[in-house]
A protein has these predicted regions:
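Class I Rossmann-like S-adenosyl-L-methionine
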Residues: 1-210
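Glycine-rich S-adenosyl-L-methionine
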Residues: 146, 330-354
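Conserved class I S-adenosyl-L-methionine
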Residues: 236-247
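Conserved SAM-binding loop of SAM-dependent methyltransferases across substrates and taxa
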Residues: 248-261
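Conserved SAM-binding motif I beta-strand of class I
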Residues: 264-269
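S-adenosyl-L-methionine
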Residues: 270-305
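C-terminal catalytic and target-recognition region of SAM-dependent MTase-like enzymes
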Residues: 297-320, 324-325, 339, 346, ...
């Protein structure tokens, strides 16, 4: 039962204590002497429990109204092993769940039995196609589904949810400073060309992280949003490039793939964690030509000595791209903070725009699908700053070829001819 108990402890830390998934795993495996095989099993059961948590919690609460959070967590571990993972002794998992039930209550084994025959998890009383149904089926908060439905319509919302429930496409950015596209495809036929130069899809059968292209630094897993944004944003390091970001991101990989020499960049990290992660990423890549500052959005002006040609703004957002990437993100997303995020995004654009030279570019990138944080925000900015014009914007959807939930906008200051 040791692995089941460890999995329960991990899930409890994630659900009750709000510890991020990867950190909870790391800490648990550090505290316990667990084999590589058992680590994989525990990780799989916890991940599976999280991917079905909304519907599982509903099932358990409907059957056992007095069941508390730790009991729900134990149920989720036992249930996920029985229906999906099937690696642990089920009698031991049942005993783990049974511990949280009263003697007169239906046993966990009897509760579980019907689902082993009919694996339909969404309760019959939930109307098919309703917001509650979609939430249970796709493990997505109802308020997010309602927002998407209002902004994009029922069909697009359904396509987003279906895509998010599947693994994202394996998209990579070729390191153009080390190898040409032609040589890359000649040497590595397991990668497929796309309509974007320098962007490929992995179609091999082996695990992508074991590919030799990583070892040689020839390609990086990276959304093409970075490449398209910087292509259209006329990034010229000699003329000045500034970045404001409030979260850890993969921009360093795009810079490595694009420039032989990376210098004359002012990088403003909007939080201490972003500052540390940026410094570490640059050090790991042996990049020395980037000046990194820690400053809030209202202090951007103090970090820029003169206007730059291109200013990239990556403020915090609802980050709904993470619904597909992280199994626990649905627990951490708080729609009540959306207005606060939008106000901060608007301020970041305003502060950065003042540091763009005439003829220069203001770039905006967020990893989310939310019109108020994307097209709506940019339209409001353009109304108030008529010296800027929109060159291009794009919303990435997870159901399209490259996957992901990113939005970028390229704005030019002054004459756009």
């Amino acid at each position: 039962m040791a692995v089941a108990l460890i999995a329960k402890d991990i899930l409890k830390r994630i659900v009750v204590e709000s510890v991020p998934f990867s950190l909870a795993l790391k800490q648990a495996f550090k505290r316990n002497d667990v084999s590589k095989e058992d680590r994989a099993i525990a990780s799989a059961i916890v991940g599976c429990s999280l991917r079905h948590y909304i519907v599982l919690e509903r099932l358990f609460k409907d059957a056992y109204p007095e069941l508390e959070s730790e009991g729900i967590i134990a149920f989720a571990i036992a249930f996920s092993n029985a229906l999906f993972i099937k690696k642990l002794d089920q009698d031991e998992c049942n005993a783990l769940a049974q511990y949280f039930l009263k003697e007169e209550e239906l046993s966990f084994a009897d509760f579980l039995a019907p689902y082993l025959v009919d694996k339909k998890l969404v309760p019959e009383e939930v109307e098919i196609g309703s917001f509650d149904f979609l939430s249970c089926r796709y493990n997505t908060p109802v308020n997010v589904i309602k927002m998407w439905n209002k902004q994009f319509g029922q069909m697009t919302t359904s396509r987003i949810l279906k895509a998010n429930s599947k693994p994202a496409p394996k998209v990579l950015r070729i390191n153009s400073t080390k190898i040409s596209d032609e040589d890359f495809f000649n040497q590595y036929p397991e990668f497929e060309k796309t309509d974007l130069d320098g962007v490929v899809l992995y179609k091999g059968e082996g695990r992508l992280k074991n590919s030799v292209v990583f070892e040689k630094g020839l390609a990086y897993p990276l959304t093409p949003a970075y490449k398209e944004l910087l292509d259209d944003g006329d990034v010229d390091l000699l003329r000045g490039f500034a970045i404001y970001s409030e979260y850890q991101n993969d921009l360093t990989d795009e810079l490595l793939a694009r420039f032989d020499n990376i210098n004359n960049i002012e990088y403003i990290a909007g939080s201490y964690s972003a500052f540390i992660s940026t410094k570490n990423a640059l050090a790991k890549a042996n990049i020395n030509g980037v000046n990194v500052y820690e400053a809030g959005v209202s202090s951007i002006i103090t970090c820029i000595s003169k206007p730059v040609h291109t200013f990239l703004v990556m403020p915090d957002s609802s980050r709904l791209n993470l619904l597909q990437v992280l199994p626990d993100y649905f627990l951490r997303f708080d729609i009540q903070k959306l207005d606060e995020l939008i106000a901060n995004q608007a301020q970041a654009l305003k502060e950065a725009s003042a540091q763009v030279e005439d003829g220069g570019y203001l770039l905006y990138l967020v990893d989310t699908i939310s019109k108020k944080e994307t097209m709506g925000l940019i339209n409001e900015f353009l109304k108030e700053h008529q010296e800027f014009t929109l060159v291009r914007d794009k919303q990435y959807f997870p159901y399209k070829k490259y996957g992901g939930s990113y939005y970028f906008a390229v704005l030019k200051k002054g004459d756009n001819d």
